[in-house]
Amino acid sequence: MHFLTEHEYAVVTRCADLMLPPHGDFPGGGVAGTAEYVDRTLGAFDFDPPRIWAGGPYSGRFGGDARFSEFLALSRLEELAWRTRIEGSRGIAEREWNGAVRGWQEVYRDGIAALGAGFLDRDGADQEAALAVVPEFADLLFEHACEACYGAPEYGGNRDLAA
């Protein structure tokens, strides 16, 4: 894991299944790799180059050179924008040119904490009710779950090309 704790990883997995449940051949957002996608995204700057832009132009899955697994270096402005988006402004002047920014890392940490330590022990209806109380977290996780399920597996989701 890169950013999430084991507990946070499990919570993200469960929430992804609540948001994108298994149906037909689709295994659900959890099994499809949402937590891995989120963990890699929130920890993108643990890698060099950061895991933001997969290379290309081909994945190699259907011909061509497999270059998606080779991530591209970011420009100075791209790094600033992505660090601000992921980490928040953190009081750093160059990240606050348009005001303070709450980063995704903080949204996830606060949202998971607000769900409570016993979240995983609740039944599905109680879990859905708990998610409704943290809309900023739930909205961001839903966006990331969709990206994880339908995006390129090199970003950590769409396990076994599930979607």
Question: Model-found features: residue ranges?
Answer:
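Flexible, low-complexity segments enriched for small/polar residues
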Residues: 12, 16-140
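C-terminal segment of N-terminal export signals and the immediately downstream linker at the start
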Residues: 1-14
